[in-house]
Design a protein with these regions (language model features):
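Active-site metal-coordination/substrate-binding segment of hydrolases
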Residues: 88-158, 453
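Acidic-glycine-rich active-site phosphate/pyrophosphate-binding loop
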Residues: 105-117, 208-219, 395
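Fold-level recognition of mixed alpha/beta catalytic cores in primary-metabolism enzymes, strongest
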Residues: 127-294, 303-310, 421, 443-451
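An extended, acidic, His-containing surface patch that forms the Zn2+-binding/catalytic region
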Residues: 86, 197, 255-333, 344-357, ...
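N-terminal helical capping/dimerization or prosegment-like subdomains
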Residues: 2-105, 333, 337, 350
Length: 470
């Protein structure tokens, strides 16, 4: 292919444009499958989604396509397209095809599984998270082959699309163990990541981890009349309030012992990139649930607080009587649910130990304390920004978007650290969605031209990697 006449030397762009209409038709078909992994009533749809993807891969010419549907995990899809050069690097593209529930469905302006086109946007559950981005990478492979005129890609491309990410990937470790040989690679490309903004393209280099737990204080066997025992027995609700108050100091720093001991701070170059990104406080607050003002750890910008600083958040408090009117009691039980966002090189198990120690220090005599972990937690991950694969992704995105690209991170969590740990290779990020795509919410959408630019970047990346990783 000779390339786009308006963009000489960019054959990937011309190839993406040639496939764009077909891409949109296929993506809409896939989005019509309600693959809600968290709902057992839709597990058949998750299987249908996996088989739809497998069929699409075969139509595209992938020579090795499999649906992994044995065992307890919901169906995952694996595919491999070997490079012509057996010495070329092997790259594993990771994504997921399960989607979030659609509740509250009455707040959708369009049916969540009809994939409605509105101007440049495609509205539907999974459009952004993550079917749209997986489809983007499939288009990238097609465009790469068309642009190079080759029958095989410049790198061996493997695809691993799981069906349980939105449920916390409970069987991902098992899949990685059982299929270790199939998934062996030199690099992982993580699809489930956004740009910073439509006019501020970025390359993500890491995401925070998370650990969650519930702390329960118990006093007597039952609630007791406050006139009978108030002031003479410890109050679990008061103790929970004091525990919560002690969780942070006046500057918002978390007071668990050695909480910051393992924190690795971003480089000066990364912080400079974050500072160079456009930031509108009013717009940011509006997208943060309509918050009324900023707060947080001194010495760090809002973006840094969200991306590269650890946090402790109170998710909910329960105890005593909260119904209409007044009930004069000393409650027998009170609890608080906490979540901790973690950054490299914090570990969920160390935070769990620190939380238990903190609770023990703040448990009054006469109360029983229990710390209930909500899962094992998810470790954080960050890739070295000087790694040649990261530089290749940045160059590919910069060429596709025709403007400077900066590094970013994301405040959420995902299985990047797990993939890195099991496969023993770096994880880089290449996505083209937006933070305001309303993922997990009504009217989830994706901006189609951004997906096309992302596909162009992916197509170019496959061409760059053999030289960069040599």
């Amino acid at each position: 292919m000779s390339g786009d006449p308006e963009n000489p030397g960019q054959p990937e762009r011309a190839a993406v444009a040639a496939f764009a209409d077909d891409f949109l038709v296929g993506l809409r078909e896939w989005l019509a499958i309600p693959s809600i992994g968290a709902d057992p009533a839709h597990h058949g749809d998750v299987a249908a989604s996996a088989h739809w993807l497998a069929d699409a891969l075969r139509r595209d010419g992938w020579p090795d396509v499999r649906v992994w549907d044995e065992g307890p995990a919901l169906p995952a899809v694996y595919a491999c397209w070997p490079a012509a050069d057996p010495e070329a690097p092997t790259v594993l593209v990771y994504g997921h095809h399960d989607v979030q529930p659609v509740d509250p469905v009455e707040q959708w302006h369009h049916p969540p599984f009809e994939a409605t086109v509105i101007g440049e946007e495609l509205v539907g559950r999974g459009a952004s998270d993550d079917k749209g981005q997986v489809a983007m990478h499939l288009l990238g492979v097609r465009a790469h082959l068309a642009a190079t005129g080759a029958a095989q890609p410049s790198v061996t491309v493997k695809l691993f699309v799981e069906g349980e990410e939105e449920s916390g990937s409970p069987y991902l470790t098992r899949l990685l163990d059982e299929h270790r040989d199939d998934l062996a690679c030199d690099l992982v490309v993580f699809t489930d990541t956004p740009l910073y903004g439509r006019d501020a393209p970025t390359v993500c280099t890491g995401q925070r981890g998370v650990y969650g737990a519930e702390v329960v204080f118990t006093g007597g066997r039952s609630d007791v009349h406050s006139g009978r025992a108030g002031g003479s027995v410890p109050n679990p609700a008061t103790a929970i309030a004091r525990l919560v108050a002690a969780l942070h100091d006046e500057d918002g720093r978390v007071q668990l012992r050695d909480f910051y001991a393992d924190v690795t701070e971003p480089t000066a170059a990364e912080r400079a990139d974050y500072a160079a990104l456009p930031f509108d406080e009013a717009e940011w607050l509006a997208n943060a649930g309509g918050a009324q003002g900023l707060a947080g750890e001194p010495g760090w910008s809002t973006l840094e607080r969200v991306w590269v600083r650890p946090t402790a958040e109170v998710n909910g408090i329960e105890g005593g009587y909260t119904g209409p009117g007044l009930k004069t009691i000393v409650p027998a039980r009170a609890s608080v649910k906490l979540s901790f966002r973690l950054v490299p090189d914090q570990r969920p198990e160390r935070v769990a130990d620190a939380l238990r120690e903190f609770v023990a220090r703040h448990t009054p005599a006469g109360l029983h304390a229990e710390v209930i972990a909500r899962g094992d937690g998810v470790p954080p991950y960050a890739v070295d920004v000087s790694h040649p694969a990261v530089e290749a992704v940045r160059d590919a995105v910069q060429a596709a978007f025709d403007q400077p690209v900066r590094f970013s991170r994301t405040g959420g969590s995902g299985p990047a650290a797990l993939l890195h740990g099991w496969l023993g290779v770096p994880v880089v990020y290449l996505g083209a969605t937006l933070p305001d795509d309303r993922i997990h919410a009504p009217d989830e959408r994706v901006v189609v031209p951004l997906l096309l630019r992302g596909a162009e970047a992916a197509a170019r990346l496959w061409r760059l990697l053999p030289e960069r990783l040599s």
